[in-house]
Each structure stands twice: as C-alpha cells, then as structure tokens.
Amino acid sequence: DSIERRALFRAHGARICEFPITEEVAADARTANEAVVMGAPNVVRGGSHLGWASAAPLAERGLVNVLASDYFWPAMMEAAFIMAGRGVLDLPRAWALVSANPAEACGLQDRGRLEAGLRGDVVVVDEARRAPVAVFAEGRLAWLAAEAAGRMG
C-alpha cells in the first residue's frame, strides 16, 4: 500500500508484489525487477472493484507482468483475450501474463512456455468462443471438451 511498505517486504526477501493498490508501488516493484501480480478479474471487470489501481493499463505499460485468477479462475483466459483486444499487447504477450510470467515468478522453469525439454502443458483454445477445447499436461491429453471429442469420431 506504500513504497515504504514494499521496501520492508523487499528487505525480508519478498520478490513478488501482489495486488499493489497504487501505480507507484507497482512501478517501484518493477524497477526492483520484482514480479507484480494483479487479478485477472480486474481486467475482465474493467478495473478494481475496490477503486484501487486498474490492472490492464498497468500491464500495458509493463508495470504488471502477472495476472492471477484471484476469486474467479475463468477470468485468466478471458483477461488475456481482453488485453490482446485492447490493441497494445499481441496475444502471445497477453497470454504470457497468465502463463510464462507466473511460472517464472514462482521459479517453475519447466513450464509456462512451449519449448523442447519443458513439461508440455498446453491449453488448446477456441479463440472465437474463448473457450478451452483440450488440455495437455506433461504432453499427454488430460481433458477434452465434449464437442471436440465428438469431432474426433
């Protein structure tokens, strides 16, 4: 809630700034190369339900680099599409807010990206419907939507 409080957390070793309520705190954390997390529902709703900082414009300026599910997990995928639709971030950069960047912030080096030798966790999305079609975990099919299963014969 303040740069001074952020400095205190930093002194204790905290390297993730969760839900900063002001732009100044987010900027301070990013200047210190810390991950800054805000809620994906904040993006979907068009702003904070508490009147605090708004996630989308901060993410567009690089001050927020992780979007978390917060209280509504479906908001993560929707937020990535909304961010891309705003025209400042392309879809890969917007998707990184809910995939590669959170993995990096948590030290999960083997996930969040599609590269040889990594886990191979993939969500296949119907972009027109903004809905998941299939999920692969560690390269293996873990879930398939009913309509996708029907198309496979």
Residue ranges and their predicted role:
Residues R15-I16, N65, D121, V133:
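Conserved acidic residues
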Residues A32-N42, G46-V125:
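His/Asp/Glu-enriched, well-ordered alpha-helical/loop segment
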